[in-house]
From Swiss-Prot:
Family: Belongs to the RNA polymerase beta chain family.
Known catalytic reactions: RNA(n) + a ribonucleoside 5'-triphosphate = RNA(n+1) + diphosphate
UniProt-recorded name of the protein: DNA-directed RNA polymerase subunit beta
Gene3D superfamilies with a match to the protein in the record: 2.40.50.100, 2.40.50.150, 3.90.1100.10, DNA-directed RNA polymerase, beta subunit, external 1 domain, DNA-directed RNA polymerase, subunit 2, domain 6, RNA polymerase alpha subunit dimerisation domain, RNA polymerase Rpb2, domain 2
InterPro entries from the UniProt entry: DNA-dir_RNA_pol_bsu_ext_1_sf (IPR042107), DNA-dir_RNA_pol_bsu_external_1 (IPR019462), DNA-dir_RNA_pol_su2 (IPR015712), DNA-dir_RNAP_su2_dom (IPR007120), DNA-dir_RNAP_su2_hyb_sf (IPR037033), RNA_pol_bsu_bac (IPR010243), RNA_pol_bsu_CS (IPR007121), RNA_pol_bsu_protrusion (IPR007644)
EC number of the protein: 2.7.7.6
Keyword vocabulary terms for this entry: DNA-directed RNA polymerase, Nucleotidyltransferase, Transcription, Transferase
Quaternary data: The RNAP catalytic core consists of 2 alpha, 1 beta, 1 beta' and 1 omega subunit. When a sigma factor is associated with the core the holoenzyme is formed, which can initiate transcription.
Gene Ontology biological process terms, A to Z: DNA-templated transcription
Summary of the function given for this chain in its UniProt record: DNA-dependent RNA polymerase catalyzes the transcription of DNA into RNA using the four ribonucleoside triphosphates as substrates.
GO CC, any one term: DNA-directed RNA polymerase complex
Gene this protein is translated from: rpoB
HAMAP family: RNApol_bact_RpoB (MF_01321)
Pfam families referenced in this protein's UniProt entry, alphabetically: RNA_pol_Rpb2_1 (PF04563), RNA_pol_Rpb2_2 (PF04561), RNA_pol_Rpb2_3 (PF04565), RNA_pol_Rpb2_45 (PF10385), RNA_pol_Rpb2_6 (PF00562), RNA_pol_Rpb2_7 (PF04560)
Amino acid sequence: MAQTLSFNGRRRVRKFFGKIPEVAEMPNLIEVQKASYDQFLMVEEPKGGRPDEGLQAVFKSVFPITDFSGASMLEFVSYEFEPPKFDVDECRQRDLTYAAPLKVTLRLIVFDIDEDTGAKSIKDIKEQSVYMGDMPLMTNNGTFIVNGTERVIVSQMHRSPGVFFDHDKGKSHSSGKLLFAARVIPYRGSWLDIEFDAKDIVYARIDRRRKIPVTSLLMALGMDGEEILDTFYTKSLYKRDGEGWRIPFKPETLKGAKAITEMVDADTGEVVVEAGKKLTPRLLRQLSDKGLKALKAGDDDLYGNYLAEDIVNYSTGEIYLEAGDEIDEKTLGIILSNGFDEIPVLGIDHINVGAYIRNTLSADKNENRQDALFDIYRVMRPGEPPTMESAEAMFNSLFFDAERYDLSAVGRVKMNMRLDLTVEDTVRILRKDDILAVVKMLVELRDGKGEIDDIDNLGNRRVRSVGELMENQYRLGLLRMERAIKERMSSIEIDTVMPQDLINAKPAAAAVREFFGSSQLSQFMDQVNPLSEITHKRRLSALGPGGLTRERAGFEVRDVHPTHYGRICPIETPEGPNIGLINSLATFARVNKYGFIESPYRRIVDGKVTNDVLYLSAMEEAKYYVAQANAEMNPDGSFVDEFVVCRHAGEVMLAPRDSMNLMDVSPKQVVSVAAALIPFLENDDANRALMGSNMQRQAVPLLRAEAPFVGTGMEPVVARDSGAAIGARRGGVVDQVDATRIVIRATEDLEAGKSGVDIYRLQKFQRSNQNTCVNQRPLVTVGDVVNRGDILADGPSTDLGDLALGRNALVAFMPWNGYNYEDSILLSERIVADDVFTSIHIEEFEVMARDTKLGPEEITRDIPNVSEEALKNLDEAGIVYIGAEVQPGDILVGKITPKGESPMTPEEKLLRAIFGEKASDVRDTSMRMPPGTYGTIVEVRVFNRHGVEKDERAMAIEREEIERLAKDRDDEQAILDRNVYGRLIDMLRGQVSIAGPKGFKKGTELSNAVVSEYPRSQWWMFAVEDEKVQSELEALRGQYDESKSRLEQRFMDKVEKVQRGDEMPPGVMKMVKVFVAVKRKIQPGDKMAGRHGNKGVVSRIVPVEDMPFLEDGTHVDVVLNPLGVPSRMNVGQILETHLGWACAGMGRQIGELIEAYKANGNIEPLRKTIGDVVGAGPKAEQVHEFDDDSVLRLADQWKRGVSIATPVFDGANEGDVNDMLRLAGLKDTGQSTLYDGRTGEQFDRQVTVGYIYMLKLNHLVDDKIHARSIGPYSLVTQQPLGGKAQFGGQRFGEMEVWALEAYGAAYTLQEMLTVKSDDVAGRTKVYEAIVRGDDTFEAGIPESFNVLVKEMRSLGLSVELENTKLDEAQANQLPDAAE
């Protein structure tokens, strides 16, 4: 492979410090979303051959629908999607939802029913395709466009369906006794709980209703008492032997017991065990070997046992005793007196087997199935009298009806695993055997056998992704629709109807709209930068419908669990009330078809690690020994150490190397994408790493992105998968490039009917959801050869295809005059002057002209009482120009609204009749810039309702758009022509012609020169002798014409869309959107951070000359507080500083060598230095083989600082950092001598100086600072509103009142509480006084006092205010405050 092609300076080359080879390919980072939704819609699948899942399964589960009489039936045949009306960009611009119309083919069958026999025969069948609303489509980046905004559907973690065994941890009962419980959770349907109470009776609950004895549930399943006992207990037969009894010897029940009396062999009569002796397993084995079959027992040994069967007189049928009765003197007497000499006894010994089910049976008041069914009916439907039919139907519908109850495939699989069953996963209802198995398992748990489940284990929690959430929602919509269809089928003349007439698709469409618009899991996409987009799509939430709530979630659910390893990131989760409930998927994790998260492992065969990769879920992994990715290995793949650190069943342990089955794929498979972007993560404290990964998501895209010197190797992956950087869809040659688009002539995947041209439109200064700027810049030049996947253009926060969230800054760790107290950050003025941390933010303003009752509003330049100066930025249509600089209060769009008519005098009426309308009946409602915003207009869009005349501005925008479309069409046409005519001339060359254009001599041999004499359009007239070539010519012609017409058609469609009116909300005639771009330089009060959770606020920006400087005169850019490191324990930032310093040092050397090369033309020293930096290793070989051009390109890339990658948990260690420093010719302490910029004196001690990657976070002081003089007031309390968004005031709270009281500032305080807040009359008076230039005013009663009085009155307390003047005598009687 020629390295010259692969490197053309378009991607960043990094020195790689990782030592562990990457075996598995990292899955696409947004696969979770895309795969799930594709599986739901199955757009690509052929109509007939769709499997029963997703949308197909939903339709199959609701249809067929029969009417109440059974005379007609509506069947589902298939569904298909029509192409969406608007593409993604059009939907964004017009505030529409990106969706495709769903057409469902339904079949209506009408039956003839014979009145006498009831036999059905088909009378009529009608099929029709019915429109069922629009189904939102996912964009290529895994998002949805809903009403013009990008949204993400977050995956939900919930408890997997199946059966769970648990106990109450001793909390329910004062004795601290463990009460065990089992719960069967279906995917949908009633929950079944089976639980013990404090008296060891087993109860069942359905849907958490009143509890009933579990034996009633078993009777309702058709069992009687004897059968129940037979199912749960073994039987022993006690036989009468002379005066005593012969009891069978069962060693397994006697283990560990003590012989109270001596044990006698019933056959030989000898004593086999002395009294008081312990029965050890060895002793019992010896007795069995000796052939001991039965023991001798007296009557008193039988007491306390229970009968296993009814004792019945078979001749009369009289029942003496029932199964389960306890044997005592009385019952034994009855048995013996009736001549029974054999007693069947239950195998209950109260040690290994408890009498719980027997006790429950005896406590149960229900005797038979009918009583049990009635009891269950009364619990489920209290107040309704039960009949046998209704009770039976209700009980069956609870667990045994596939319509109402669905365990789902997952539930069945989990149930099989837990209960050791082997049932097909298509059996989605409960069976009698399932319930019995659950009760058996629960009783065994109570007897001390088996383990309870851990509900936080990822084997018991599963992920519901978009597709599944959508499926459930759509099912709800269809079920609502089903009721309406049934009613309509019964009430309508069925013979004359088509399926279309029965269907009202509104409920289904509404369910979809409701889900995307207002579900808790449908979220406004976090679009600050590419990383925040990707993280949002990979998020797992335990909240949402059917999930947990913040308040009820305890510590256990939020905690990190051993099964999270390689599946869920232990670091990245929000701080605050949602901690641990919202998680992020680990880098290599994927979700399997059952919704469980899987992680990849390498197989170990015969003690050697292979490159065979296996994905396992938490349940499957438990039985293996898994070695860590960094375990030391020999070249042949065997382990170096005898004992290897590994994970097994949730524990980390040392185990012999022979017992290893699997090995981790990569050290970064533990963490999420954001955490994997932090270099030296292994040296940071986890709390700070959490902050670091969360803050990277808030980094604002800067004006000039710059990739970090010290990266981790994850950067290109994020840039590519997020869709921020544009990758080539297929290989080809770059044909045209400008700032807005790239045209590539494809050289691969050239199928017939597929365009041979790829046009990539770049987004220019678009607004993101968070008002940051999305802008893409081309990296390629005309004539470049590109391969599939090559990066063609950088997006926001990307640099040469690498994620670039911030900038490399020269940092010194030292105190500086107290300006870095409490994590504050001191910056140099150079950073402001060079726009290092400058970002662009785009705000959108929209104005609508509505049709009001008094007449239509109008967008116009003609505004009453506004000076010409204020209109200077508006065009003749009243809309601001693109490129205008605007400030607070400037008019963006002029708009007038009709005012209410005032009654006119006859004179006015006369004047109006003579001179026409007058201008004073409108008021100015123009849109103006809000306070505190300055910027430049970058885009204006005008939307008109159908049939409303377009203004000049709208026409101009439309013309521009059509020109742009025409240019696209012409370019594509030109490339098509060039390709086709090129192929045509190749075919004709050397052929003998038999026909040609007018005036052409037949029989001539064709050559380039001959053909070129004629215009291109006439080339098709040539015909040749060779029939094979002639047929190829005709095929080419057909293909060309088809491509041409397809292109023209596409162009016409788009033009038609541009020209036709827009769909508007009701009552809106016209809408204008104005986009204002604001350039924000960094300033004091802005928040900045590094990647290690080291955040701070800019405290001061100092002139460059005052900043500390190095010996070569370089001033540092940033001064950080050294005290921010030790207590926070994020040492990673120090290692990053040193390594960054070494990178810059190497870059300086390379820069000097480039200059030397320019002077003497010798490239070898440069090649050698680059080779030394890269070193050896798997990723280094290609760099050593670069040609001279590539070396120069790479040197140019590296001259500011060498790019390196230090992957998490496998990166550079202290030795590597020292080596790099030495290579760069720097001291290996990493410290430098600094001089004070103000005095020029040297600082006493050496200072750590180096490069740190700093981010500017989306917490800008401009968005927060805010002032109000007058503004809106709250309706009830009349106090000013709060917050910047409401233009509110500052709250003067309780503590501030204390401060003024402490100063004794009584008048100031009174003002604060009255006229400056909610004394309505007082504040107007103050205003009037100030206007008069007078400063006397009086404070009245605050409105909040009136509210208080009203509230007390509403409680029935008569509070009256007495308004009396006190005379002097009364005043003197008042208690003196001073006393």
